[in-house]
Design a protein with these regions (language model features):
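Cofactor-binding active-site loop characterized by glycine-rich and histidine/acidic residues
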Residues: 31-212, 217-219, 223-241, 246, ...
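Active-site phosphate/pyrophosphate-binding segments
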Residues: 573, 583-587, 591, 596, ...
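Structural motif
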Residues: 68-72, 135, 148-149, 179-183, ...
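Cofactor-/ligand-binding subdomain signature composed of acidic, glycine-rich
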Residues: 1-46, 67, 75, 446-457, ...
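Thiamine diphosphate
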Residues: 55-59, 136-403, 637-802, ...
């Protein structure tokens, strides 16, 4: 066991001031929770989830939390955020109301429900702030235990900064690796696999992580006996306890109502983690939930009278009050005065937040009412329009929706009248303004977004031949990347010692060390989380998921956390993580999947790149490292030994993102595909040319973003026919591709035949060469599909094959 140092002694007067300050923060937080619930139940807010019953341990955590540290927590941590000075009473209520002004609700500008916290890591131009000079919180998400994988990466970043030299601007992100990543989770959520995966990984990596489990014995209405073996998470994690000459954890237990012991425990945990990079788990038990889980219900429904009586007695604020009286910190009357002032201050903050939320909406309401009355004066529908205006004007607390609904309904009435233009213009301007409030920042809006990367062609020697294994091009390009960007690192299953399963990292660990080129365990979700957390702290991680089929283990974190990060923080945080994987065709159900439809529909907010060969893939990595956005790069699993030309400008050539490439020009039909399937398309096109069919072949290269220059429709204007070839299931990625071409690019007007798709079968691909042939599109399938489309247009020239 590791012993903590003794802290310097405060005078009693200093101690008293500190305790009273803490108590004031706790009681303010409690009053916010109580009043917040009332605001929901009276209809002013939609939903509330609060931190009541967890206030006192969060005070202790805040005392140990230093500048540069990061929090990765969940929706109970309002007291902590108040204690570190990152949440005011008025901001608390602004979040509850969903105020779309980032100044009023700095957590998410109303995009997340209240209780989801974040600090701002970026300046207005998207550049990094000095994170060592502020207390940091990564942005919360609701999915239970979803904060855990990211926590691992936040902690690992400190280890990287402590041990890897030469990282540019490291001093803005770390003070020699002394930062702690602080995690919080409810006891019930420790049942999630993400919790155990993270706990195990942090124990292996030995990173400075302090994990607090807030234990009130319930998960919504479900008691711990249904959640946790032995009803005690620290008991069942005993095997992780660090012993001499082993890795592992320090595991501490403390009662959530014992203020003094909580302070001691958190100071001890911080010292262990900060100085020694040993993870610590603090099991904070005997906590309560005075209002139940959320505003959706009451805990009286599932707790008996004895439990409710115990919760009233051992409410952490009540116990802190009794302790303060017992040691003469304050008299009951003095504490009552603090309580009364807190109630008054919270009420005033609530009113200020509500007025700030409502005033701009009322201004828009009045502006529209005035406009409608003006239009009504000369309209054939004066009575109806006046009624709409009066009904809108009568709403005391209008919603933006109600304003726009009224305007749009009136527009229908006056579609043939002179007032239409001014109202339509008002609607368009209002919609544009408000849509930005709700829809901006899905992707980066800075000058370093992916569209800033300019195409740089590979440079080849005059006598270059296609005689180099594709994997060697990747290897040599990664070598150039690791030299050029000291902040880059790559990690994954088999990525280290053997240089990945396809030798694309051959020799890299030996050259750059085990921290920058690392093997990890079989745990895809936390591989992804490592990348998110380190990217949040200024590093440029490349997280390798060994096969595309295994991405499903990580897809929830990709979808819920990484993909939404810039959106849910309104561009105030970023994690430019590169996810490297390999997929499409190889062997059998579990090593030849191409679930692209699932992926692209789950990860909007992450770019999805599908290079056809390793030169294109290497170019994507080079492009992405100049940008500030996350991306998934899917290398072709069956392409590592295929021959390509060897470039001479490794680390410099760049594949443009969102730009298609025409591999073959033609006049009869446009064939659109990507990845491994393109080689079959090229083979089929060659055979089709022998029967007089001239195909144009387009490599998408990128699914998200999709053909930003709208070049595909230009091809269709020439060929008037379209076939999308995809090895995903029917209606998978091919449906998205078709929607983009037909709807977004308006290609329908140029088609002489119906657009068609050729996809894999609905089942997973079967094993073996024959299994592949009967599961996924073959060259013969492509030939016959194209031939049939041409037969439809000219049966005489192209007689039916069957």
């Amino acid at each position: 066991m590791i012993k903590e140092k003794t802290n310097s002694t405060l005078t009693f007067e200093d101690f008293k001031i500190e305790v009273l300050k803490d108590y004031t923060t706790a009681i303010i937080s409690r009053e916010c929770s109580l009043l917040g619930r009332k605001e929901v139940l009276t209809g002013k807010a939609k939903f509330g989830i609060f931190g009541d019953g967890k206030e006192v341990p969060q005070l202790a955590m805040a005392k140990a939390f230093q500048n540069g540290d990061f929090r990765s927590g969940y929706y109970r941590d309002q007291t902590f955020m108040m204690a570190i000075g990152e949440l005011t009473m008025q901001q608390f209520f602004a979040g509850l109301y969903g105020h779309t002004d980032i100044e009023q609700d700095p957590m998410s500008a109303g995009r997340q429900m209240g209780g989801h916290f974040a600090t701002h890591s970026l300046n207005a131009d998207g550049s990094w702030k000095d994170l060592t000079k502020q207390k940091n919180s990564s942005s919360d998400i609701s999915p239970t235990a979803g904060q855990m994988p990211r926590l691992l990466g936040l902690a690992q970043a400190s280890k990287i900064y402590r041990n890897v030299k030469g990282i540019p601007n490291a001093a803005n992100f770390s003070n020699q690796g002394n930062e702690i990543a602080w995690g919080t989770i409810g006891n019930a959520s420790t049942s999630e696999g993400l919790f155990f995966e993270t706990i195990n990984a942090a124990g292996v990596l030995q990173v400075p992580m302090v994990m607090s489990v807030w234990d009130d014995e319930y998960g919504i209405s479900v008691h711990a006996r249904h959640q946790t073996t032995k009803e005690n998470i620290s008991e069942i994690l005993k095997g992780y306890q660090k012993e001499e000459d082993t890795n592992g954890y320090e595991i501490l237990r403390v009662k959530g109502w014992d203020y003094a012991e909580l302070i001691t425990t958190y100071q001890k945990a911080a010292q262990i983690a900060r100085e020694n990079h040993i993870p610590v788990l603090i099991h904070v038990n005997e906590l309560t939930q005075p209002q139940g889980h959320s505003s959706s219900g009451s805990h009286e429904r599932y707790k008996n009278s004895d439990r409710l009586a115990w919760e009233r007695e051992f409410d952490c604020i009540r116990q802190m009050r009794l302790w303060m009286i017992a040691i003469n910190i304050a008299s009951p009357e003095e504490i009552d005065a603090i309580d009364a002032q807190a109630k008054k201050d919270v009420m005033e903050a609530k009113k200020a937040a509500w007025n700030a939320f409502l005033e701009p909406i009322i201004a828009d309401q009045k502006a529209l009412v005035a406009l409608l009355n003006e239009i009504a004066a000369t309209s054939e529908h004066k009575e109806a329009i006046t009624n709409y205006a009066n009904e809108l004007n009568a709403i005391k607390s209008p919603l933006k929706k109600e304003i726009l609904v009224t305007a749009r309904k009136v527009l229908r009435l006056i579609v043939a009248e002179s007032g239409k233009a001014v109202l339509a213009n008002w609607i368009n301007e209002y919609t544009q303004k408000e849509q930005k409030n709700f829809s901006s920042n899905l992707f980066s809006e800075t000058e370093k977004n992916v569209f800033s990367a300019q195409k740089v062609l590979p440079v080849y020697a005059d006598d270059a031949k296609e005689d180099t294994d594709g994997r060697m091009i990747l290897r040599d390009n990664f070598d150039a990347i690791f030299t050029k960007y000291p902040e880059t690192l790559i990690f994954g299953e088999d990525a280290g010692a053997i240089g990945d399963v396809n030798q694309g990292l051959e020799g890299m660990q030996e050259k750059y060390g085990e921290l920058r080129v690392a093997d990890v365990g079989i745990r895809e979700a936390t591989i992804l989380g490592q990348g998110i957390g380190m990217a949040l702290r200024g590093l440029r991680p490349i997280a390798e998921i060994q096969y595309l089929d295994y991405l499903l283990y990580a897809i929830q974190i990709m979808s819920d956390d990484l993909a939404t990060l810039q959106y849910r923080t309104v561009g105030k945080q970023k994690a430019p993580l590169i996810i490297r994987t390999r997929g499409h065709r190889l062997e059998g159900i579990w090593h030849s999947g191409s679930p692209m439809g699932m992926i692209i529909n789950a990860v909007r907010g992450i770019h999805v790149l599908v290079p056809r060969n390793m030169t294109q893939a290497a170019g994507f990595y080079n492009s992405l490292l100049e940008c500030d956005e996350p991306a998934l790069v899917i290398e072709c699993l069956n392409g590592y030994r295929l021959k390509e030309k060897m470039p001479s400008n490794y680390g410099e050539f760049k594949t443009p993102i969102g730009v298609i490439e025409t591999l073959k020009t033609g006049n009869d039909i446009t064939l659109v595909s990507y990845g491994s399937t393109l080689r079959l398309v090229q083979q089929a096109a060659k055979e089709l040319s022998e029967v007089g069919i001239d195909c144009e072949i387009i490599d998408l290269q990128s699914l998200l973003p999709f053909d930003i220059n709208q070049d595909i429709v230009k091809s269709i204007q020439k060929t008037n026919r379209l076939l999308v070839i995809d090895e995903d299931v029917p209606g998978g990625a091919s449906a998205f591709i078709l929607q983009q071409i037909i709807e977004q690019q308006d290609a329908y007007a140029y088609l002489d035949s119906k657009p068609q798709t050729l996809t894999a079968k609905a089942h997973r691909p079967a094993y073996g060469t024959d299994g592949d042939y009967f599961s996924k599109p073959s060259a013969e399938d492509i030939f016959e599909k194209v031939y049939d489309m041409m037969h439809e247009s000219n049966p005489a020239l192209y007689p039916s094959l069957y």
